[in-house]
From Swiss-Prot:
Span of the signal peptide: none
GO cellular component, one term: cytoplasm
Superkingdom per UniProt: Eukaryota
Keywords linked to the UniProt accession: Coiled coil
Record region (Disordered): 372-399
Biased composition (Basic and acidic residues): 372-384
Organism: Danio rerio
Alphabetical GO biological process terms: Golgi to secretory granule transport; vesicle transport along microtubule
Coiled-coil ranges (or none): 34-341
Protein name: BICD family-like cargo adapter 2
InterPro entries: Spindly/BICDR_Dynein_Adapter
Length: 414
């Protein structure tokens, strides 16, 4: 592969004696280099144009920024002028306020002197009021002592009333408790009455069935007795027949056959009666067992009724009614006592209210007298104070008129 050559080599290449292939390669290479240089030149030209457009945009932006800066400078100068004008106006107002403050302090000093004089007079009046208050307190102390004497009896009655109210509350609670207890006992009594009626019916049924069983048992006993007697007679007859058979073996054949037949019939009747007797005895035993169970059940019911009647924890209905009557009588008595106490308390409160009304009237009269005296003194002081303010106002008006005359003369001369 041929080495790369520059532009100078290409220009100097015609002077060399080379082969036409090398010359052709050099020309191709020169064309490629020229093409690359043209592309590079175009790229640089486009970059230059872009930079020029950016430069123009920056110049326009710079121009706009300069214009904004000039506008801001103009606004700042106007704002500064306005602020300077405001500062000068505020300084003038401050100077005016200083002047007004000096005038006000002068007036306040004068008013303070007048108020100190007025305060001195008020101190003297306060001393008089304190002495008057001391006398009123002594009178009030005596009145309080009298009131304590009356309130002592009132407190005793109120304490008694409180105790009676507490007792009444306790009795009411007891009454409600007794009502609840009575209600529960009534419910228990109703339940027990129903149970008792059921037990009575059950006992009556058991007694009737027991009587029926006893009658049946007596009948069975009688039948058993009859069967036993029949059995005994039959056994006696059998024994007699056996004896006759053993003694009369020597008799004729028909007689022995007839006796055997009679003996067999007697044995059959004895066996039938014994089976019937056995059945009757079994039925008697069954009836005796049933009778014994019914007797035990009846005895249990009697024990339950006896326990209910003799139980100390469950009071009877009559005792509960007596206790309720006593509680109601006690409640009525306490209510009557409470009403009497309330009436007595109302009478005492009316007496205390009338006494307090008298005291209030006396105190109001004394306070009105004090207020009238204070109003008289205040009116005197107001008249003196108004005279002083009128003199100061007249002097101030005269000074202002002198100033106006001076300024009018000054401007008129100009």
């Amino acid at each position: 592969m041929a080495p790369t050559m520059g532009v100078d080599d290409l220009l100097a290449s015609p002077q060399d004696d080379r082969s036409p292939t090398l010359l052709e390669k050099d020309l191709i290479l020169a064309a490629e280099v020229g093409q690359a240089l043209l592309e590079k030149n175009e790229e640089l030209a486009s970059q230059i144009m872009q930079m020029e457009s950016e430069m123009e945009a920056m110049q326009q932006e710079k121009h706009m920024v300069q214009r904004r800066l000039e506008v801001r400078d103009l606004e700042a100068s106007q704002r500064e002028a306005e602020l300077q004008a405001d500062i000068s106006a505020l300084r003038a107002q401050l100077e005016q306020k200083h002047i007004q403050g000096r005038d006000r302090r002068r007036e306040e000093s004068e008013q303070l002197i007048q108020l100190s004089n007025h305060n001195q007079k008020l101190v003297e009046q306060l001393a008089e009021a304190v002495s008057l208050e001391h006398t009123l307190r002594t009178e009030l102390r005596t009145l309080r002592e009298e009131m304590e004497d009356t309130s002592f009896s009132k407190s005793i009655s109120s304490a008694r009333l409180d105790s009676l109210q507490a007792e009444n509350r306790v009795l009411k609670e007891r009454c409600t408790h007794m009502d609840e207890r009575l209600k529960s006992t009534q419910e228990d009594n109703e339940r027990l009455r129903s149970e008792r009626d059921g037990l009575r019916e059950r006992a009556i049924e058991l007694q009737t069935s027991l009587k029926d069983k006893e009658t049946e048992l007596e009948q069975e006993h009688s039948t058993v007795f009859q069967l036993r007697t029949v059995n005994r007679t039959l056994q006696q007859r059998v024994q007699a027949l056996g004896e006759e058979a053993s003694l009369g073996e020597a008799t004729c054949f028909p007689l022995s056959l007839q006796s055997e037949i009679q003996q067999c019939q007697a044995k059959e009747t004895i066996l039938a009666h014994s089976s019937v007797l056995r059945e009757k005895e079994e039925e008697i035993q069954r009836l005796q067992k049933e009778l014994q169970s019914r007797e035990t059940e009846l005895e249990g019911l009697r024990e339950e009724v006896k326990l209910f009647r003799n139980s100390p924890g469950k009071p009877t209905y009559k005792a509960l009614e007596e206790e309720m009557i006593l509680a109601r009588q006690e409640r009525d008595a306490l209510n009557q006592q409470l009403l009497n106490t309330i009436r007595h308390k109302v009478a005492l409160s009316q007496e205390v209210e009338s006494w307090q009304e008298d005291m209030r009237l006396v105190i109001c009269q004394q306070v009105q007298l004090q207020q009238q005296e204070k109003e008289k003194e205040n009116n005197k002081e107001r008249t003196g104070f108004q005279r002083g303010t009128r003199t100061t106002k007249s002097l101030r008006l005269r000074g202002e008129e002198g100033r106006k005359g001076f300024f009018s003369a000054l401007f008129g001369g100009d």
